[in-house]
Regions:
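Low-complexity, Pro/Ser/Thr/Gly/Ala-rich intrinsically disordered linkers and tails that serve as
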Residues: 10-33, 37-45, 52, 62, ...
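Active-site core of bacterial EAL-family cyclic-dinucleotide phosphodiesterase domains
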Residues: 55, 76-146, 327-331
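Catalytic core of bacterial c-di-GMP phosphodiesterases, primarily the EAL and HD-GYP domains
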Residues: 152-227, 303
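Charged helix-capping and loop-helix junction motifs
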Residues: 196-199, 227-230, 279-286
């Protein structure tokens, strides 16, 4: 099996069949349309989806119009975010997601990935939040299952990619921020309607290939057949790189990852430290950092929430980390981009 150092049976990760009674999202539109309005600040970019759903990707206001502070209500880490005040049935949540897509209420949030020991942001993980009509924030943990079963995940990925490209363009090539990790689902990579448009869009923005990193989770990748991995090769041929997230099985074929254009491996702190201190069946955590280095793979330790964990990570030479301790996700806004620019100039 690819990405695993030992053999075993695999199961296909083809797009799931929609759940009974759940509406299916319309075909995916052109991603390039999401940037059509970039030169006209008064016109939102509109992505048309067949005749039933229109996705709006609103252009961010200019830096001159930026507020001096970022709304504090939007600065909560997803893991610490409260459950929505209202309880939603699947059909109600489906309507919330569809309305958010139609009305430009799918927001991009950025969570810092910092260097150690300096704790300087060098990367950001791009995340999405959905706002209801009453501006209640809905995190992926609440809407993901419905979005997946209804086929709306590619639409949400669509918005995330367009907004990530917009933000990276604003930061510019001289920024010290090296890139964004953009979470993308395997369903999106396998979608026959969406993927050709994705390739075209990424080819048009190939100048950002060093800055935009596609992030996929290990369980989904392990479930792919070799024949389904062509999407990774296609994007890799354009110069784009990948990050493997949610790594819980350290029995990994790192050479295979490298050959498939993976350059980052993310492991949560508990998994990483447990293997260091107790010993796991796969690669011992104590050797993981140096071993990854031999394949030019960067280790990122996630879910770092306290100083004690940082001290242990430093003992093992970890150089990149993210978690509540270093900053919660913030909504992309002119204020945030200005903050990043000022950090660059410092």
């Amino acid at each position: 099996m690819l990405f695993r150092s030992t053999g075993g049976a695999t199961t296909s990760a083809s797009a799931p069949t929609p759940a009974p009674g759940v509406a299916v999202a319309a075909p995916i539109p052109s991603l390039a349309a999401g940037l059509d309005a970039e030169d006209d600040e008064d016109t939102p970019a509109v992505l048309k989806v067949a005749e039933t759903l229109t996705i709006v990707v609103e252009e961010e206001p200019s830096l001159e119009d930026a507020p001096t502070t970022v709304p504090s209500a939007a600065l909560k880490e997803e893991a610490a975010a409260p459950e929505p005040a209202q309880s939603y049935s699947d059909s109600e949540m489906l309507d919330v997601v569809a309305q958010a897509l139609e009305n430009g209420r799918v927001d991009l949030y950025l969570r810092p990935t910092v260097t150690l020991p300096e704790r300087r942001p060098r990367y950001f993980e791009a995340l999405t939040r959905i706002r209801t009509r009453s501006d209640e924030l809905i995190t992926p943990s609440a809407y993901l299952s419905v979005a997946e079963s209804s086929g709306m995940i590619p639409l949400i990925d669509n918005v995330q990619l367009v907004k990530s490209v917009q933000a990276l363009r604003r930061l510019g090539p001289k920024s010290r921020i090296k890139g964004f990790f953009c979470n993308i689902s395997v369903r999106t990579l396998l979608d026959p309607e969406f993927f050709p448009e994705l390739v075209e869009f990424m080819e048009e923005n190939s100048g950002l290939s060093e800055s935009l990193i596609f992030e996929v989770n290990q369980p989904a990748i392990l479930a792919l057949e070799t024949s389904e991995l062509g999407s990774l090769d296609t994007l890799g041929a354009l110069g784009y790189r990948f990050s493997l997230d949610h790594v819980s099985d350290l029995d990994v074929d790192f050479a295979g990852l490298r050959d498939r254009h993976f350059r980052f491996v993310k492991v949560d702190s508990k998994t990483f430290l447990h293997d260091m201190e107790v010993g796991g069946k796969g690669l011992p955590g104590a050797d993981m950092k140096s071993y990854l280095d031999t394949f030019d793979l960067k280790l990122v330790v996630d879910q770092v929430d306290d100083e004690g964990t940082v001290a242990k990570l430093l003992d093992y030479g970890v150089e990149l980390a993210q978690g509540n301790l270093f900053g919660a996700p913030k909504p992309v806004s002119p204020a945030l981009l200005r903050e990043l620019e000022e950090a660059d100039a410092a």
